Design a protein with these regions (language model features):
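Amphipathic alpha-helical segments
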Residues: 35-51
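Conserved short beta-strand elements that form part of the metal-binding/catalytic scaffold
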Residues: 5-16, 51-86, 92, 131, ...
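Vicinal oxygen chelate
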Residues: 35-38, 89-138, 146, 166-179
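Short glycine-aromatic motifs
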Residues: 24-25, 50, 111-114
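N-terminal beta-strand motif that seeds the catalytic metal site of vicinal oxygen chelate
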Residues: 2-38, 88, 148-179
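Short glycine-enriched loop/turn motifs at secondary-structure junctions
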Residues: 23-26, 81-85, 122-123
Length: 179
């Protein structure tokens, strides 16, 4: 049995659209920009282990484990660098796999044009690290002992919407993308 099927017994979350104007049945995809599809695809497949398909001349779709995809669009020099808070999470099965991925990111930094590799940390209930790829997209390689998506929604709101966001405490805002 694959790790995906082992961890995610039921991958369907019923849409809660009774009170909404739009009545979606699924959140299907996201997008990110890249300088070069060819170079980015090499990183996605060889380093991150993502499945890629070139469905359009300026774009590829990438996925891993779930039927949710990211559209990577080649925009050349028009890439808009993003902050680490705008990142894509990739889950691995153990803390040791996080450590191995971190070591590999440092080892193959030049081969895959990885711009930054931040230290491994224990934060927000996960053991993880962030890295900035060749296109200024950020990735979090993480281990969580369970299925985080399910747990977050099962636990429900921990704070009232009247509670302040405490934006000044977000240390991630101090992390700068590379030039």
């Amino acid at each position: 049995m694959s790790q995906t099927r082992e961890k995610i017994q039921d991958g369907i979350a019923d849409a809660k659209t009774e009170q909404s104007i739009v009545k979606p049945y699924v959140m299907s995809h996201g997008t990110m920009e890249c300088y070069s599809l060819k170079e980015s695809r090499k990183f996605y497949e060889e380093f991150l282990g993502l499945e890629c398909v070139r469905h359009a001349k300026p774009a590829i779709v990438v996925r891993c484990g779930l039927k949710f995809h990211i559209v990577a669009v080649e925009v050349g020099a028009a890439v808009h660098p993003v902050n680490v808070l705008n990142h894509w999470g990739v889950d691995v099965a153990t803390k040791e796999e996080v450590d191995k991925a971190h070591e590999a990111a440092l080892k193959y930094k030049d081969k895959y044009n990885i711009r930054q590799v931040l230290p491994v940390v224990m934060q927000h209930g996960v053991y993880s690290f962030y890295m900035e790829d060749l296109d200024h997209n950020w990735w979090e390689i993480q281990y969580y002992p369970g299925f985080q998506n399910e747990d977050l929604f099962d636990f429900g709101d921990r704070f009232s919407m009247d509670d302040g966001a405490e934006v000044g405490e977000l240390k991630e805002l101090d992390i700068k993308t590379t030039a």
